[in-house]
Amino acid sequence: MCNFLFLLALGVPQASETLTSSGVFLLQMGWGDLGAFGEPSKETPNLDQMAAEGMLFLDFYTANPLCSPSRAALLTGRLPVRNGFYTTNGHARNAYTPQDIVGGIPDSELLLPELLKKAGYINKIIGKWHLGHRPQFHPLKHGFDEWFGSPNCHFGPYDSRERPNIPVYRDWEMVGRYYEDFKIDLKTGEANLTQLYLQEALDFISKQQASQQPFFLYWAIDATHAPVYASKQFLGTSQRGLYGDAVREIDDSVGKILNHLQQLGISENTFVFFTSDNGAALISAPKQGGSNGPFLCGKQTTFEGGMREPAIAWWPGHIPAGGVSHQLGSVMDLFSTSLSLAGLQPPSDRQIDGIDLLPVILQGKLIDRPIFYYRGNELMAVRAGLYKAHYWTWSNSWEEHSKGIDFCPGQSVSGVTTHTQEEHTYLPLLFHLGRDPGEKFPLSFASEEYQQAVERISGLVQQHRATLVPGQPQLNVCDQAVMNWSPPGCEKLGKCLKAPESDPKKCSWPH
Amino acid sequence: MCNFLFLLALGVPQASETLTSSGVFLLQMGWGDLGAFGEPSKETPNLDQMAAEGMLFLDFYTANPLCSPSRAALLTGRLPVRNGFYTTNGHARNAYTPQDIVGGIPDSELLLPELLKKAGYINKIIGKWHLGHRPQFHPLKHGFDEWFGSPNCHFGPYDSRERPNIPVYRDWEMVGRYYEDFKIDLKTGEANLTQLYLQEALDFISKQQASQQPFFLYWAIDATHAPVYASKQFLGTSQRGLYGDAVREIDDSVGKILNHLQQLGISENTFVFFTSDNGAALISAPKQGGSNGPFLCGKQTTFEGGMREPAIAWWPGHIPAGGVSHQLGSVMDLFSTSLSLAGLQPPSDRQIDGIDLLPVILQGKLIDRPIFYYRGNELMAVRAGLYKAHYWTWSNSWEEHSKGIDFCPGQSVSGVTTHTQEEHTYLPLLFHLGRDPGEKFPLSFASEEYQQAVERISGLVQQHRATLVPGQPQLNVCDQAVMNWSPPGCEKLGKCLKAPESDPKKCSWPH
């Protein structure tokens, strides 16, 4: 039987006892954070090895320069403006799922694990969910079979009066809280969470291999997200400081996971993809922030530094070693690609933005498709081929900037990294990302090259806008009452807290 | 017999018929221009392969952020402030050898080929010499046996009245001039010079192999120096535009040269080093300028973008494949390393700044040594370990900057990329290049880390300054009469021009 059903084969193992599995690594890291992508301290031997054995994507994008919307896009294959992971509280404002958010992933969305489940997959998420923390948004209600991790970011510590510490779940119930039961030392940066997440991954893989069940593992760790942390054995080991320590621990973990797959003899049956949910947060640099290599700005922006991501596909025996692809890729493609590997069809009742990358990965094809750069409710920029047109520019407001909040530290391109929202709808700013990957030299409006490229891109925009049906925005309303006061399982632990009265209001999204 | 005399063995081949040879590639390219260093279009498969088979240096420096002084430093193993390749016409001004320069490499300097000659080497320079073009500075008077290339930059075309076109030499005599006999089409960027230089290299290597003579080949090409050029077959083939076309042609040439060594069976007897004489000239970006990856600014500055260079050592069978070194290295080390390979001692009557890198390359050792960043006559900055202290900062003057001359386009770090020369002697600006490779976040003066690091670096500076004997500055005087009016051999070609009367004056160095 054809082994093409590699990743997401239906039901039980094939006659050949092929185990068909998939793993996605997702974390907050910049394009320039890996040795294979030119990080000058070159401290990621395992990821570099993964790249050498697999395929490196140099033009791979997230769907949004912020965590929650990107993750929602990955799991639904749809832009945040469709799946509801955006806000209309302000123009072009980024929004995510802090613990006072009321919204989350709508039931109407079909998530990758829900679809894979029908094909017999056991799905596990390890790490940060970030698609809403109220009961109806729980990952096990959206296709995952297992979960170990947290619903929100590991911010804290909180005082349990104004704000409870974020819970950590095992499956349906919480098993403790960050800073209380799962320590993060903000002074030293020590926390053993990555080790816990690693062990979870290894155990899950072993279990699936033993039971010969195909699996989908979504390893969504967050050690490189501020507050950055690393285990004791990695603290102080990097040239890059605490952030580098965290990267090294993740690199080590990836090596151990890939090695585990090989030891168990299932590496040729496991499609693994490594990428990030947004660019490095330069606002946290250098202590807690990574590198976007030669690209402009970082997280929160629709410049390349905010949305171009490191990406590696690994599947020994199928993907030729050492491959390099210039395919314009998106995290949303992982949705479509996984379905394709499973022999499943994507849902036909809705627009799917992801494309099937298998022809790219297995046959080296290049598929012509645009990349849309959204910030909240606004289409800020579009890339087609090597051209990128900005229809709106801004980094953040003067007000924020004057307080020292800087998404582009050390970088300033006049008229480009603007601190007011500037519209360029009628004369978009155009860059050639081959000659000018750093978006520093807008093409002359008068040039023929400009006119040809903009004409093409504007056609794509028109088509996109004409067919766009925005989803109900999920990230508009906040309410202290919905915070993690009494998550399921809190009673057993004596960790239930009293919620304040409900007082829903518009969330404030400053940038 | 021990094969340790690999590179520069004395006299004729050993009993084992070992041919001991060396090649240095030197060109104007930025740290971030190679795929192996994270260039996002990854168009250098041959150089990346060279790195995979050899050792990648991530912390390798040139001796000056400008061409002539760097090349003089490489060939003498000495800082430009010692060998005379600097100016005292203005404080901290860069200077080089345009065709009206009066000075050049002093006879008192001992060049690498002069020393190797004594050990039986045949030495050839292909490409740009740049150590002075008046008769006494001719490369064949300084140890080279053969030359094909030009004494100065390929600027032009000139009108032969105000300024003659730069000659191209074969050995002692000119064989034509740029733009006249060696075409460079400034409109299309077409020129077949790299192909000529490639063929010269292949022929020279073949000849040396046939005669079993050890050789030193210095392949100092200049296609990536503005005006950037490429051969017809490479024009339009790069994502990166003309600059990328030139890089691709160089990459292809390097591949052909390494392949030739392998075909001839002498790759294991040939130590090859690839590096650059200064960072990418961002002032020429994006059309004619490369990338310095994550580093600050470019050519002309003493920020990392101006002086940290791509560097690869290749020596199959000796250097373990895939090695990566964090050794602080310098182009001046190529002088000392080559002598060491030849079993020769460096001259003992003068200060040599280069160190022998063999323990690093062959045994993976790390040698503690500082890097001094000079701009003209001023020590601007010093690196020790991961710390870099700036004693002076400036990019260029406000006057130049206001005319659009920008060495840091899109980059601006307050108080760092200054447009006045700012002295920090008593409180140097300190950066940790591991956590902050982009030199964007100066350490707090009050921190213990600052005090410890600056104390150490200041000790190194004191020691360096106390023993420094500056050479007679060679780049102070310019005179139209010394231009390439009638280079040797011009009579045979009918290409002699009449020189104007001598009118020496101080050269003007704007930055």
What is the predicted role of each segment?
Chain A
Residues 2-428, 437-476, 480-511:
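Formylglycine-dependent sulfatase
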